[in-house]
Structures are given as C-alpha cells and as structure tokens.
C-alpha cells in the first residue's frame, strides 16, 4: 500500500515516516525547509507558493491523492494538519480519524488506536477511514541510510483567504516536549508565590517547570506554553514530578508517556496516586524544602 504523508512541521513528518515506512511505500509532502530525505520516503515533495493556506494546500493534496493513486493519507496532528484533514475528508468523500497513535491493517479495514475519555483509556477502532492524523511525539525520528528523491512543487492557485493583518505570537522560551525532567505545579500550590519553590526544585535537578490547566489558563500563574494536558502539551520526560496536582483525566492525558512519575499531594485520595510510580502524601511546603536540602548534599 502507498501512503501520502503531510505535515507543515518537518519533525512531525519525520516521525510519521518513521512509523509507516516499514509497512508502506510513502511520499512526504511538506511546506517545511527541514531536510527529510533520510526518513525512508520514496520522494519528498516540498510545497512552495506565495500564499499557502489550508484551502489551496488541501486542493493540491486532494488532486495529488487522486493522481498518484495513494491508498491513504497520514497527516501530522497540528492545528493546520487537523484543518487540512477535515477539508480533505470533504473533498475526497473519505472518512477521517484524528489524533491516532497506532495504525494497522485489518480485513479491508484499518485498525486504529487513540486516547478516549480524556486520555483515561484507549479506544481501538475498525473503520474504512482513509485519512488519519497522528499525534506528535509518538516516536523519535530515526534516519535510514538511503536517501529519498526530492522535488519542489509550486502552488500557483490563489487562496480564498484574505489576510488583513498578521500578529506574531511571541516565541516561547521553553519546549516541554523535549524536556527530560519536568516539575509541574497544580492548583494545590495555593498561590502564585508557591512557584518559587517549584522553580528551585526544577533548577537543582536541571528540569523545566510545567503546570496544570488551572495554573496556566485560569490563574495565569504560568504561561500557556507550559500547560501539560489534553488541551496543552503532551510530554514524555524521563521524570515527571506532579506537585499539588489532583490528577484529573485531562492532565493525565498530557503526561501519560512519562517514564517515571512522582506525585506530591497532601490528599491521600488524589487520583494522581493511581497514576504515579512514587507518591508522597504531605504538604508540598514541607516536603519540597526537605527534597531540596537533600539534593544539595
């Protein structure tokens, strides 16, 4: 079977290629400048144009899908990727399944797995869908020895989008998805000033500071880029320390890939203790200073 892979993010395209290349012949389509010729694709097509938006990119991909006779489309699950997937589903009259983390072939169907019920469980589905968006961070991109052919394709068709103004979003200072150690704060810290002790612990163990949805979006104690959860970042560090986090399913969905989870919470019945490898029941303002003291020795 042959697959069309698309992502505007080079790393995400490389991740999907790493997942699919052993079982399928793949071509990569991207608007990224990242070198992608070492990830097992037959051809890497770089899409260029003066005004590239989801509408003309989708129209182009739909035409190529029919022209090349691909069997299915694998798209990186980004804001743009999900929008393009929905447009392609309409243009090609094909079913789409989003946010998947596993894809297999069945008897004239595809079998997919994705998080369900806020990440608390995994749903395994059989369907005739032919468009899939893949969650980011499922694998680390692994290059191969062979090299792909490369082609550049310019889209000349104008977009129907009329850009009135562009406001650049400030670039973040942290990339939680890449962090090996994360110390996350929940509403249980009680006050913004409590982040000071969280930062101290993170600094000593060379980690990054993250936060739950309430801390980042409701109270604005931390920036949005530091939110871990279903609607925030999905992380998989070597060590994840949850401080004052109750462990609601929305948060667990974002840190489920962590190798070792340590929880600190004064509520012994907090759901986070069902998800952690090591748990400490106690007041964080007593526990963390003792941890810092011992780590300094």
Feature locations, PLM:
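N-terminal glycine-rich FAD/FM-binding segment characteristic of electron-transfer flavoproteins
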Residues: 1-297
């Amino acid at each position: 079977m042959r697959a069309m892979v698309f992502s505007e993010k080079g790393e995400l395209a490389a991740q999907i290629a790493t997942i699919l290349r052993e079982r399928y012949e793949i071509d990569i389509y991207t608007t990224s400048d990242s070198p992608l010729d070492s990830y097992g694709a037959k051809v890497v097509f770089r899409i260029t144009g003066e005004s590239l938006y989801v509408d003309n990119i989708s129209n182009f991909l739909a035409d190529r899908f029919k022209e090349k006779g691909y069997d299915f489309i694998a798209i990186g699950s980004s804001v743009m990727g999900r929008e393009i997937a929905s447009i392609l589903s309409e243009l090609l009259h094909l079913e789409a399944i989003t946010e998947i983390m596993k894809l297999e072939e069945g008897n004239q169907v595809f079998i997919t797995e994705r998080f369900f019920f806020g990440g608390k469980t995994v749903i395994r589905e059989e369907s005739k869908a032919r468009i899939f968006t893949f969650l980011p961070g499922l694998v680390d991109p692994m290059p191969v020895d062979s090299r792909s052919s490369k082609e550049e394709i310019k889209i000349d068709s104008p977009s129907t989008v009329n850009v009135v103004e562009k406001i650049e979003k400030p670039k973040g200072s942290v990339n939680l998805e890449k962090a090996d150690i994360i110390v996350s704060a929940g509403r249980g810290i009680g006050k913004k000033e409590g982040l000071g002790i969280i930062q101290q612990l993170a600094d000593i163990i060379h980690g990054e500071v993250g936060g739950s949805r309430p801390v980042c979006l409701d109270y604005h104690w931390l920036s949005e880029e530091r939110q871990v959860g279903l609607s925030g970042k999905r992380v998989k560090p070597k060590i994840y320390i949850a401080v004052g986090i109750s462990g609601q399913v929305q948060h667990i969905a974002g840190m489920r890939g962590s190798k070792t989870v340590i929880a600190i919470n004064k509520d012994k019945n907090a759901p986070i203790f069902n998800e952690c490898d090591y748990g400490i029941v106690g007041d964080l303002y007593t526990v963390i200073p003792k941890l810092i003291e011992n780590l300094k020795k």
